[in-house]
């Protein structure tokens, strides 16, 4: 029996990004099909689509119109496309949409903490919980109550998380990671980096991830 090929996967993304929810679910399905062939360790890296977003957030329709010039009808079509893609990969988007765009910096600080002081599986679980809270239930991912509920859900230390949110722990580390990836050409997400060498950009179907990972594993 062959030994599975070990792969490091850095998943660069933002909780605010619906395609990141689709992409992560697709990647997970691909890895399930490659079980026994590939042994992957996922690391979640920060990217902010709207780093200047204030605590009050912004209506999602107004935000997308201002940022991209899209009409509400165009946005509805895109939202339905994303919803269908999510359903294909096992991610259920909230039927009414997200409602508002929020700042995600504190969520990234907690994810960094989970990666530093927790196990990779806990960081992965927290990422999933945050994506479901925002895209699945339209909750506010900048709200400490929502963030702490996600922390509890995945079994991380709520007292430590509360202290992080009350201060500025891991703020510099998150900004450094964001700068690292943007300086290396990552300007859209999701970006999936395999073994720090191979880049897969975008929320591809699970079949595409499976094919790419299989090829990379054969070369490793």
Language model feature labels by segment:
Residues 4-12, 16-36, 44, 111-112, ...:
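C-terminal cap of thioredoxin/glutaredoxin-like
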Residues 24-134:
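Structural alpha/beta surface segment adjacent to cysteine/selenocysteine redox centers
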């Amino acid at each position: 029996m062959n030994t599975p090929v070990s792969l490091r996967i850095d998943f660069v993304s933002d909780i605010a990004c619906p395609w990141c929810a689709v992409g992560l679910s697709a990647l997970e399905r691909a890895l399930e099909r490659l079980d026994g062939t590939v042994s992957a360790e996922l690391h979640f890296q920060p990217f902010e689509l709207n780093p200047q977003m204030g605590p009050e957030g912004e209506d999602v329709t107004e935000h997308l119109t201002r940022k991209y010039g899209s009409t509400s009808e165009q946005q509805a079509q895109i939202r339905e496309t994303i919803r269908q893609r999510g359903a294909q990969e096992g991610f259920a988007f909230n039927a009414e949409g997200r409602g508002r765009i929020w700042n995600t910096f504190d969520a990234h600080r907690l994810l960094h903490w989970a990666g530093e002081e927790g196990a990779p599986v806990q960081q992965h679980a927290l990422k999933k919980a945050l994506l479901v809270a925002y895209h699945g239930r339209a909750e506010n991912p900048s709200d400490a109550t929502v963030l702490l509920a996600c922390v509890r859900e995945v079994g991380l230390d709520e007292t430590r998380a509360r202290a992080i949110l009350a201060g500025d722990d891991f703020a510099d580390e998150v900004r450094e990671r964001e700068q690292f990836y943007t300086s290396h050409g990552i300007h859209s997400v999701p970006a999936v980096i395999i073994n720090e060498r191979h880049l897969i950009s975008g929320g591809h179907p699970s079949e595409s991830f499976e094919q790419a990972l299989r090829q990379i594993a054969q070369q490793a």
